[in-house]
Amino acid sequence: MAIKIGITGPVGSIKAEALQKIIGMLQNDGLNVQGVLISKVSDDGKLTGYTIEDILTKKKVQFCDEKFVSRVKIDKLGVDTRLLEEILIPSLQKARESADVIIIDEVGKLENTTKKIHSEIEETLKCGKPLIVTLHKRSRNPVLQEIKSLEGVRVFDITPINKNILPFKVMHVLKGEE
């Protein structure tokens, strides 16, 4: 049974910082880490969009922007679903084939953008590989509820107090030491 880890926390960069640290630790252990990372784009402190990056290929595109006209929105910003699918779908397919550990950053924001993305994320959540997902802490989030219901899942809530120790705790869980 593959270990599934959910990292929840407040809006802000502490989840991203912890995730980057975990990815670095996994790669230092010689593991093949694949999946996607989401980053905020801001202008003078105002959120203006999001980028998605394939961890393996380093290909990165801005898929969400205040200037994009779209029915699909994330945080009231327009989403270019074609750009999102171009990175996310092949990244998760490849990760299911060849990764040692799969990462899906901000899964809650992404999951309901298109049916293709929803099914790709569902398939990845159920695959037999170790998986780390991050999402905003919202108890009514259906993705969080789904992740919690998966067999072998551990959910950690990151806070400013535990943000430095959490990556080590996640590593212990992935190694079966906890």
Curated annotation (Swiss-Prot):
This is Nucleoside-triphosphatase THEP1. It catalyses: a ribonucleoside 5'-triphosphate + H2O = a ribonucleoside 5'-diphosphate + phosphate + H(+). GO terms for molecular function: ATP binding; ribonucleoside triphosphate phosphatase activity. It comes from Thermoplasma volcanium (strain ATCC 51530 / DSM 4299 / JCM 9571 / NBRC 15438 / GSS1). ATP binds at residues 9-16, 101-108. Keywords: ATP-binding, Hydrolase, Nucleotide-binding. Belongs to the THEP1 NTPase family. Its EC number is 3.6.1.15. The keyword Nucleotide-binding applies. It is an enzyme of class 3 (hydrolase). Has nucleotide phosphatase activity towards ATP, GTP, CTP, TTP and UTP. May hydrolyze nucleoside diphosphates with lower efficiency.
